[in-house]
Amino acid sequence: MKGLKFAPVVVACGLFFASPVLASGAQVEKVAEDPGAYAEVVALLEREAASQLTRHLQQTGELRQVSVSIRIDMKNRSMMVSFGPGYLPGPEGSYDELFLIPMASSLRFYAEKSGLDVNDIDFLFDGKTLEEYYPEDLAVPPQVQVRSTQTSALVSASHGYISLHPGREWEFQRPAPLGVQEDTLSPAYGDELQGLIEQRSGLTVHRARSRSTELHPESGKPWEHMSSRYHLKALFPERTDMWNEFPNSPASAREKDEDIRARPNYANHLGVDVMLSLHTNGSESASVRGTEVYYHQEKPQDKPLADSILCAMQEIIRAQPGYQDFPIRESSSAARHGENRIGTMPSIIVETAYHSNPDDVAALQDPVFRAASMKGVEKGYRLWAAGKTCEPLALHPIPDVDVLVQSSRDVGLGYTGNPQYPLAVELSLTSCSEAGACTPTTTTFDDPVKPLAITLACNGPGSGVVRLTAVLRDADGVATAPVEFAQACVRG
């Protein structure tokens, strides 16, 4: 398998990547610099994409031969997957986004594990983008100007039950390979985020799905498990343009396609300032995991919002015990979801973790992870809305301090970052010249307007030196690296 023009034909099943072929250490550098190793990895990626397409076409009853080729732009950290003639998704099935976007995630994972740095992945179909085939349907609507003072948000949490035609069977839209159903789990994340946005950002929050536990009359399922389409049908029965865009479609799952569009249609109807969509991700490979945030390929102006949210999620999630190494992407990714294309306001999609990975499933069911991840989403949005940059929390250096014996002295502290109040400054002992004479302290600060200052005291009659380590910790558990300084008790 040499050269970059290897284009496998869809004929096989099974994953071509497994743990032994993933690069590490010196192999990563080799793949990036060795043309032969690079070509080998690209060929393996092409085989993996072809294998996934085979299974997808088998499941849809449309198996046929389709070539697949891949090009990677190392400079722009991007990948282009090109399908040959015979595969062209259409409006029925929402342009296969529930197949193509998970495929992109797995290809990104395998590329990075093999030593190729990839962030954005796009697709061509016989040499053209989907927008070239469907220019009217996939056009991004004109975007409203972002208001300096924002007042409202739509939180859209996952999918929910839809009805299949013609038998009218009711099914969840997402699989649950490890027993965690995204369609029932994500609304609790929406509840968490709604409370945080209302409390910390001061916005009115609307929800795309009902949270009622009463039964939906037609399905007999709880309203809170139904998709947005049926909730909006109940709210606006006359607005079929909002929730019933494909009444004449022959597709069995046409109401799934309508549901994807109903959520941003509702955001446009409300005129909210931002749309935040929450999901869990899934992959054919149980190895793929972690937190991702997406903006639409044709709405690059939404990338700063997506990056800010991802940055804040990383900061707060990794501040929690047990989650210091939780995988979170460094940069948001461009994709072509319908959910964040149709909205006329900034719209991003948060894939909190993978419901197909055992470690991620454990995290998704942990209230600590749920709270931390949604605090990150809210904080990232709030910083973006205020024009602030997400940056690490860090204490400024603290100079050594002399304090007269039997007196005290206030010492001001500076920091960078955007901590959540109340704050605590924790002073721990590194050394003390007189055993038992020095005491660790914690000082709490509730008012973000007042400057930070700690009081250092020398209460005894004798002189001496204590070396202290200071840590600034915020209400979300985010802490600075320790800063060491000395306090000397001196005679006047």
Model-found features: residue ranges?
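Low-complexity "stalk/linker" and mucin-like segments enriched in Ser/Thr/Pro/Ala/Gly
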Residues: 398-400, 431-451
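Active-site histidine-acidic residue metal-binding/catalytic motifs
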Residues: 140-264
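Short beta-strand elements
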Residues: 477-492
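Short, compositionally biased P/S/T/A/G/V-rich stretches that sit at domain boundaries
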Residues: 383-407, 437, 492
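A short amphipathic beta-strand at an alpha->beta junction
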Residues: 104-136
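Active-site-adjacent mobile loop/cap segments within catalytic or ligand-binding domains
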Residues: 277-289, 294-295, 325-391
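Short edge beta-strands and adjacent turn/loop segments
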Residues: 54-84
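A short, glycine/acidic-enriched catalytic loop
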Residues: 168-178, 281-307
